[in-house]
A protein has these predicted regions:
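Cysteine-nucleophile active-site neighborhood
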Residues: 1-68
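Amide-donor transfer/coupling interface in amidating biosynthetic enzymes
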Residues: 11-14, 47-153
Length: 153
């Protein structure tokens, strides 16, 4: 973003318009990423961490692979207009090795379990961001995108 001079435009959009971050778009909102040990936009307090490969175990004890690829349940942290018509525990499609760890858990709009419980969606004012890919998440993902289009924070 800095090399292309896009930081001011992204910061302006995040401050003044409905803003949806998807996957790395969620991660870049935080202060620092372990991926490449780089600073991010620092719009939200917290960091981006890597899944701990060696410790990734499912509830049945089986080893979980990193990156996390596939469908997983998303447990909503409370009511939000972007969750309208989407069941709590609905499955969305993920492809990632890193996840956000907000400094303030009240930013968490959803959590997902994949060896560890991680924040899979965040919300604050006009910002909503997700770790999963709604564009690849069938009806639930399309519903979230439609809700975003109608959203007026």
């Amino acid at each position: 973003l800095d090399a292309r001079g896009l930081r001011p435009a992204v910061l302006d959009a995040a401050a003044s318009k409905p803003f949806l971050g998807i996957c790395i778009g969620q991660q870049m909102l935080f202060e620092h990423s372990a991926e490449g040990d780089v600073p991010c936009l620092a719009i939200l307090a917290g960091e981006v961490l890597r899944f701990p490969d060696a410790q990734m175990r499912a509830a049945d004890g089986s080893h979980l692979k990193v990156p996390h690829m596939g469908w997983n349940e998303v447990w909503q942290g409370g009511a939000h207009p972007l969750w309208d018509g989407i069941a709590d525990g609905e499955r969305f499609y993920f492809v990632h090795s890193y996840f956000v760890a907000p400094a303030d858990d009240s930013l968490s709009a959803a959590k997902t379990d994949y060896g560890v419980r991680f924040t899979s969606a965040v919300a604050r004012a006009n910002i909503f961001a997700v770790q999963f890919h709604p564009e690849k998440s069938a009806a639930a993902g399309l519903r979230l995108l439609a809700n975003f289009i109608r959203w007026q924070p």
